Curated annotation (Swiss-Prot):
Keywords: NADP, Oxidoreductase. Belongs to the ornithine cyclodeaminase/mu-crystallin family. Its EC number is 1.5.1.49. GO terms for molecular function: oxidoreductase activity. Catalyzes the reduction of Delta(1)-pyrroline-2-carboxylate (Pyr2C) to L-proline, using NADPH as the electron donor. May be involved in a degradation pathway that converts trans-3-hydroxy-L-proline (t3LHyp) to L-proline. It comes from the Bacteria. One of its GO terms (cellular component) is cytoplasm. PANTHER family: KETIMINE REDUCTASE MU-CRYSTALLIN (PTHR13812:SF19). It catalyses: L-proline + NAD(+) = 1-pyrroline-2-carboxylate + NADH + H(+); L-proline + NADP(+) = 1-pyrroline-2-carboxylate + NADPH + H(+). This is Delta(1)-pyrroline-2-carboxylate reductase 1. The keyword NADP applies.
């Protein structure tokens, strides 16, 4: 029997069960601090072209306690083939011996840690939200609806899609896991909305409201330099925070298109350590990095250890 055959491999459902949102949020907060302190190595992701417009993404990261490698294939033509667009796994290894410890489902890790990073930013920059608007009706919106329900159970969740029907269908499909979900009534965003999260694949703005005190805007969907979900004027008039300063300079299209002064952009670590004082119109842009996948693997490792002690 090979070492690989002895390595536990968890599918999407089992991976989700290992990544409880409150535990993931707490581990992410510690990992953000470790990453900012230089205790985690997380190089820029390697992108390798596949056939028919697909790409293979290689994202390793290592710390004193764990090393991980996320390998994900994104194949846009898979929908027509009846296959998932995103396929991949995250391998967690002992940081000293290199032995493989377990393997998690890649898309599930990405989806849950992305939603948890958003929630961590909301908690740190805004506190407990009352009325949240999700713009988008795809998988990322579903992950965020589940995360917000777990972490902010008293908040009401509004959804706006490209069509009113898509928002209604999304709410009906996911209300069992997020009972506070409701379609936004009309296109205008009510003043009561205190957190807006953009979760689309649009390359042009889906959020154009003016920057305003008391409302946190979180940009999640845009991940290339020329794509922006949030209007440039809104970006320029907001106080800016990013999850990963290194990656944001290349991938945070909302900020790049707005031609922001990067010296004025704070990091999530700055917020968590008290260097950045919240207040005024604020915008939090996330681009993700392998260090956040490492946080997910730390969470899964701890969950597995807890199971063994029962």
């Amino acid at each position: 029997m090979t070492a690989l055959s002895r390595t536990p491999v968890f599918d999407a459902a089992d991976t989700a069960a290992l990544l409880d949102y409150p535990a993931l949020l707490a581990t992410l907060a510690r990992t953000v601090a470790d990453y900012a302190a230089g205790e985690i190595v997380s190089p820029e992701r390697l992108v390798v072209p596949l056939q028919a417009g697909g790409v293979m993404l290689s994202m390793p990261s290592s710390a004193h306690d764990l090393a991980i490698h996320k390998l994900v294939n994104v194949c846009p033509g898979n929908a027509a083939r009846g296959l998932p667009t995103i396929l991949g796994q995250v391998i967690a290894c002992d940081a000293t011996t290199g032995e493989m410890r377990f393997v998690l489902d890649g898309p599930t890790v990405t989806g849950r840690r992305t939603a948890a990073v958003t929630a961590l930013g909301v908690q740190a920059l805004h506190g407990t939200p009352r009325e949240i608007l999700l713009i988008g009706t795809g998988k990322q919106a579903a992950n965020h609806a589940e995360a917000f329900t777990a972490l902010f159970p008293d908040a009401r969740l509004h959804v706006r899609g490209s069509r009113a029907a898509s928002a209604a269908e999304f709410c009906a499909a996911h209300r069992a896991h997020a009972p506070q979900l409701m379609p936004l009534d009309g296109d205008a965003i009510p003043d009561a909305i205190d957190v807006v999260v953009t979760l689309t694949t649009s390359r042009t703005p889906v959020y154009r409201d003016a920057a305003r005190e008391g409302r946190l805007v979180v940009g999640v969907g845009a991940f290339t330099a020329d794509a922006a979900e949030i209007a440039a004027d809104t970006v320029r008039r907001s106080r800016l925070v990013v999850d990963d300063p290194a990656g944001a300079r290349h991938e945070a299209g909302d900020l790049i298109v707005a031609n922001v002064d990067w010296q004025q952009v704070a990091s999530l670590a700055d917020v968590l350590n008290g260097t950045f004082a919240r207040g005024g119109p604020m915008l939090f842009k996330t681009v993700g990095c392998a260090a956040w996948d490492l946080a997910a693997c730390r969470t899964a490792r701890d969950a597995l250890a807890a199971r063994e002690q029962r």
